[in-house]
Regions:
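Bacterial N-terminal signal peptides
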Residues: 7-19
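His/Glu-based metal-binding/catalytic segments typifying zinc-dependent metallopeptidases
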Residues: 173, 242-303
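Short, polar/flexible loop-turn hinges at active-site or ligand-entry regions and domain interfaces
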Residues: 82-86, 134-142, 364-367
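Non-catalytic, conformational "gating/processing" segments within enzyme and secreted inhibitor domains
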Residues: 148, 197-233, 437-438
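Active-site SXXK
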Residues: 70-84
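M16 family metallopeptidases and their MPP-like homologs
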Residues: 44, 49-65, 71-75, 89-133, ...
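N-terminal secretory signal peptides that target proteins for export/translocation
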Residues: 1-5
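Proteolytic maturation boundary segments
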Residues: 18-43, 222-262, 275, 308, ...
């Protein structure tokens, strides 16, 4: 049967809107509304440049996948570009490329997101394409077979052949013994090898519903211009039932876990991960902000304790970093990654003891006013500079909304960071830097014996 393609009236949206922008101000007007079918919409005005980003966030990711079906959400992301009622396979990307619209998509633990950055008068194109993809994707078996081979090749390139990624995947599976966060977003290879198009269609029908999505628009637009477009293209989609997401809760203290890996790398590497709450699970958001600052204080900047003493001072490590991502629906990890200096002869066990000395020091010796203010200034500057790009603004807005936290909390984040005290840092270290919460990976040089 022939498929009619390119039925969209794209030319109608090549004419610019008139009187789009209002004078820019320091405060960014942000609007929200919900369509009758359940689609939530957040619009933030930013009139500094005549561009806009449109992001459609679905509350479905790798954490929602049952055992044996890892990688479903990421595979579905790929397949949404393989044709729908108005589009042939690959035509969405072709349309965007022809119009100079930057576009892509990504899958994470809790979300799948499709986004475009474009001129304001092109928003109708973005909305029509996204609305069609989210409601009438074909998901044919004959399209899935070659695309699955592409996904498997992507996994080999980005995971199996990447020693850093492989080590991180092993650590994640160890660090999340009770929740689905331990599975890789792209999926385990043995699950990919038995995945089929019928599973994708079931996943699509159960998860891709207006009520399970948030549309985020940031840029040179106004609510008066955007809302009619949203209603025109997304408002006609029928409401449909969908599977509610479940928070991926982890055991608070699963017990100490350790793994030893052997890889052909230049120097031994130490990975540590502590089970901690996220913004979606913390009982007190002050804890989240304390952990965020603690990451900067530990090994998140060149003035942090680990880098200043062990990397630059004693030259024990050649590279160190600590990370804490609070933007999850389920529980998170506080991680430390340290690579031994090539001239060092001490073991990773000894290196880990040195790290523990600094971790325990935070419990008895909280940061002084100057140390804390320096870290706070660095972190706040990073947050404020991140607002320069409309894509980054939309990404954080969508992340907050998709984990069940209002975008207003994002706007208040800087104020909350200013309230964190040295005692908050000390309490966070005492609570979460424990061996009962720890997973460790020792990555040794050489082949597996």
């Amino acid at each position: 049967m022939n498929i009619l393609c390119s039925r969209m009236l794209l030319f109608a949206w090549l004419l610019p809107f008139s009187a789009l922008a209002e004078p820019a101000s320091l405060a960014q007007p942000t609007h929200e509304f919900t369509l009758s079918n359940g689609l939530r919409v957040v619009v933030r005005e930013d009139h500094r440049a005549p561009v806009v980003t449109s992001q459609l966030w679905f509350k479905v990711g790798s954490a929602d996948e049952p055992p044996g079906q890892s990688g479903l959400s990421h595979a579905l992301e790929h397949m949404l570009f393989k044709g729908s009622s108005k589009l042939c396979a690959g035509e969405a990307s072709s349309i965007f490329d022809t119009l100079g619209i930057a576009q892509n998509a990504f899958t994470d633990k809790d979300v799948t997101t499709y986004y475009q950055t474009l001129l304001p008068h092109q928003l109708g194109v973005s909305f029509e394409v996204l609305a069609d993809m989210m409601s009438t994707a074909h998901l044919r078996a004959e399209d899935f077979v070659p695309e699955l081979a592409v996904i498997q090749a992507e996994r080999r390139l980005r995971v199996d052949d990447d020693f850093n990624a492989t080590a991180q995947h092993h650590l994640n599976s160890l660090a999340y013994p009770a929740s689905s966060y331990g599975a890789p977003i792209i999926g385990w290879m043995h699950d990919l090898q038995r995945m089929n198009a019928a599973e994708l269609r079931d996943w699509y029908q159960a998860r891709y519903a207006p009520g399970n999505a948030t549309l985020v628009i940031v840029g040179d637009v106004t609510l008066e211009r955007v809302k009619p477009l949203v209603e025109r293209y997304f408002g006609v989609l029928p409401a449909k039932p969908f599977v509610l997401t479940r928070t991926a809760l982890e055991l608070a203290e699963p017990g100490e876990r350790r793994i030893i890996l052997h890889q052909p790398i230049a120097a031994p590497r130490l990975l540590m991960a502590f089970n901690v709450p996220s913004l979606g699970t913390a009982q007190n958001q002050r804890t989240v902000h304390a952990l965020t600052l603690l990451s900067t204080l530990l090994a998140g900047s060149d003035s942090s304790r680990v880098r200043k003493r062990l990397q630059f001072g004693e030259r024990l490590f050649s590279a160190t970093t600590s990370e804490y991502n609070a933007l999850f629906r389920g529980d998170s990890l506080f991680t430390l990654d340290a690579e031994l200096h090539t001239r060092q002869t001490i073991s990773l066990d000894e290196a880990e003891k040195r790290i523990w000395q600094l971790l325990d020091e935070f419990k008895t010796n909280p940061p002084g006013a100057e140390e804390l203010e320096r870290a706070r200034t660095q972190l706040i500057a990073k947050r404020l500079y991140g607002r320069d790009a409309i894509e980054d603004q939309a990404d954080r807005l969508g992340s907050f909304e998709s984990i069940g936290v209002s975008w207003r909390e994002m706007d208040d984040e800087v104020n909350q960071l200013r309230l964190v005290t040295p005692e908050d840092i000390q309490q966070a270290a005492a609570t979460y830097f424990t061996r009962q919460r720890l997973s460790t990976a020792h990555v040794l040089v050489g082949a597996q014996p």
